[in-house]
Curated annotation (Swiss-Prot):
Keywords: Cytoplasm, Methyltransferase, rRNA processing, S-adenosyl-L-methionine, Transferase. One of its GO terms (cellular component) is cytoplasm. The keyword Cytoplasm applies. This is Ribosomal RNA large subunit methyltransferase H. The gene is rlmH. One of its GO terms (molecular function) is rRNA (pseudouridine-N3-)-methyltransferase activity. Belongs to the RNA methyltransferase RlmH family. Specifically methylates the pseudouridine at position 1915 (m3Psi1915) in 23S rRNA. S-adenosyl-L-methionine binds at residues 72, 104, 123-128. It is found in: Cytoplasm. Gene3D superfamilies: 3.40.1280.10. It comes from Cytophaga hutchinsonii (strain ATCC 33406 / DSM 1761 / CIP 103989 / NBRC 15051 / NCIMB 9469 / D465). Homodimer. The lineage of its organism: Bacteria, Pseudomonadati, Bacteroidota, Cytophagia, Cytophagales.
Length: 155
C-alpha cells in the first residue's frame, strides 16, 4: 500500500513548491508515499464541463481498480487532525491497493470521478485555491503520520 497525493496541474508559486517539497521529503520516513502532479489539459479555452471531462480521462488513465480514491472536496467530511490520523490508519489497515487523495483543478471534479470516489474529505469550510490546498493537504498528511507514530509534532 502506498499513500499518494495527486493534483491536477503543476504548482506555480515558488513558496508553495518549496513547502510541498519539504513535506514530500518527510512523508516517506513514515510510509511509502508519492506526490503526483497530473499535467492539466493543454486547451485552457475549454468550458468548465469539458475541462473536467478531460481531467477525468487523465485521472482514470492512472487509477487502478484496487485503489481507494479520496477526493478533497468542499462538501466532504471534516476531521480534526487526530481524527484524520485515525481515518488514515483505518484505511491503511483495510486497503489492498493504494490510498490516493486527489485535489482537482479549479472547477472541481466530473460526475464520473465523484461516482468512482471511495470518499470525500474537506480540509476546512473555507475555500482555498487548488494551488494552496496542496501544501495544506501535504502538511495534514504529515501531521497524521506523526500522530499515528505518537511523535511530538502535533500538540
Amino acid at each position: 500500500m502506498k499513500l499518494q497525493l495527486w493534483t491536477i496541474g503543476k504548482t506555480n508559486d515558488a513558496y508553495l513548491k518549496e513547502g510541498c517539497a519539504q513535506y514530500t521529503k518527510r512523508l516517506p520516513h513514515y510510509l511509502p508515499f508519492e506526490y503526483l502532479e497530473i499535467p492539466e489539459p493543454k486547451n485552457t479555452k475549454l468550458s468548465s464541463d469539458v475541462l473536467k471531462k478531460e481531467e477525468e480521462k487523465l485521472i482514470f488513465d492512472r487509477l487502478q481498480d484496487s485503489d481507494q480514491l479520496i477526493l478533497l472536496d468542499e462538501k466532504g467530511n471534516e476531521f480534526t487532525s487526530t481524527e484524520f490520523g485515525q481515518y488514515i490508519q483505518k484505511k491503511m489497515n483495510s486497503v489492498a491497493g493504494n490510498l490516493i487523495f486527489l485535489i482537482g483543478g479549479p472547477y472541481g471534479f466530473s460526475d464520473a470521478v465523484y461516482k468512482r470516489a471511495n470518499g470525500k474529505i474537506a480540509l476546512s469550510k473555507m475555500t482555498f485555491s487548488h494551488q494552496m490546498v496542496r501544501l495544506f493537504a501535504l502538511e495534514q498528511l504529515y501531521r497524521a503520520c506523526t500522530i499515528i507514530k505518537g511523535e511530538k509534532y502535533h500538540h
